[in-house]
Amino acid sequence: MPNTKSAEKALRVADANRQENRRAKSQVKTSLTKVKKLVDAGSINEAETAAVSAQSNLDKAAEKGIIHPKNAARRKSRLMKKLNQAAK
């Protein structure tokens, strides 16, 4: 339990930030999974449009500091590698 008003506010702020970070991470994971499923199903055109959204989600998460920028770059690279291999 917080003992001061500032500690109460810090608790509220931390909770709000945690919820936002969890939402953003979940959105990233969902968009990546969607692309992978579309690639596995052979829907390359739909996968390409979903990949644009996934890259955007990764960039936004990296920009906000939710994930490390190099983590976002690595995930985008692997995603596009998988998409390009499926397109061949």
Curated annotation (Swiss-Prot):
Residues 1-29 are annotated as: Disordered. GO terms for molecular function: small ribosomal subunit rRNA binding; structural constituent of ribosome. It comes from the Bacteria. The keyword RNA-binding applies. One of its GO terms (biological process) is translation. Signal peptide: none annotated. GO terms for cellular component: cytosol; small ribosomal subunit. Keywords: Ribonucleoprotein, Ribosomal protein, RNA-binding, rRNA-binding. Residues 1-23 have a biased composition (Basic and acidic residues). NCBIfam families: S20 (TIGR00029). Binds directly to 16S ribosomal RNA. Belongs to the bacterial ribosomal protein bS20 family. This is Small ribosomal subunit protein bS20. The lineage of its organism: Bacteria, Bacillati, Chloroflexota, Dehalococcoidia, Dehalococcoidales.
